[in-house]
């Protein structure tokens, strides 16, 4: 009897795994909107890929695989274990993930509502999609080496640059939303408490930035030949000061009363992170001390020599992973009623936007049904661009690939080396980020015929 009930329970998941029905949720979870649940599932799948890539970079993993009798090729096995671990494995895994999301992005172009047959592929058929993704990843491991790694390094660098820009847009949106929320609460009541919270958060961000600048000058500008680092730190510091001053100018405050120093402080902290991340990729090791060497635990170079494995757990890599996770999940759960996010996701037709808030009661969720389903809230129009969402995850896959391999390039001498290209990609992205933020401040003054509310 128990087995029959178990089979019936499993059968209830078949529409989720193999059909276009809204995905079933676990009983402990509240019913949610299909638009949010779908994005979270895709983001979680990408997170699983990140975890697998991290496992592939664990030191000694190849040695452990070699211990499996008959598994590795060098023991007359069938699997070349040297390509299952290390940076090459990360490149191939991320190549498979990137191709999976790119194919979905191309397939979902111009989907306007969930009534489009292609929307069924986006919101359902999970078993087949993930099976296809795994097949693509496995196939990537059979790609001949040739110039694959070199070409994919440059593709990954370009994609990671684009994803950093998306991170910046999401960060600007988050900063504006954060400030707007706290200002509203301050105006509604208990103004002293919320004003203190707003002031404390702003001061903390600027304090962290100031401490970072001091540490940068102390540890990343010596010897005297580290002129590039001095220029990077000085220029970005001046740009952040200029953006902060601009955010509180009377003209800016008049056109955008809720712009302020909180948003500027968030952008300043992120700019300092990008500056630090860029300096850690400098080929000149004297200007690029590791965090462990700074705090006195290690005096070795951050660039691995011949025979050494890539250490993906460098501090800047860990922070990059954390920011990646926050941005991906923020973009997945962000409600669609924010105009800046709508512009980012290319959902320009405001009349088709549906609020991502409460569940619809149009029969999608039957009363008294104790099975929790994701409610289809996109019958009248999508809440986000399916195509752009997948394209963003495509770029995220490339960003993860570059982050886990520390933006190193594999040389014919079998060494992993930092490249000035990676330095300039990160520094230029920090400058573009400040320009984007300044544009959000001055746009209402320049484009007076447009509504920026």
UniProtKB/Swiss-Prot annotation:
GO biological process, one term: phospholipid biosynthetic process
Ranges per topology, Lumenal: 61-88, 145-151, 219-231, 281-309, 409-426
GO molecular function, one term: protein-macromolecule adaptor activity
Residues listed as glycosylation sites in the UniProt record: 298
Alphabetical keyword list: Endoplasmic reticulum, Glycoprotein, Lipid biosynthesis, Lipid metabolism, Lipoprotein, Membrane, Myristate, Phospholipid biosynthesis, Phospholipid metabolism, Phosphoprotein, Transmembrane, Transmembrane helix
Record topological domains on the Cytoplasmic side: 2-39, 110-123, 173-197, 253-259, 331-387, 448-453
First-listed, main subcellular location of the protein, grouped into a coarse class: endoplasmic reticulum
Positions where Phosphothreonine occurs in the chain: 352
Gene Ontology CC annotation, any one: membrane
Disulfide-linked positions: none
Pfam families to which the protein is assigned, alphabetical: Serinc
Subunit structure: Interacts with SPTLC1.
Primary role: Enhances the incorporation of serine into phosphatidylserine and sphingolipids.
Entry-linked PANTHER family: SERINE INCORPORATOR, SERINE INCORPORATOR 1
Family, similarity comment: Belongs to the TDE1 family.
Protein name: Serine incorporator 1
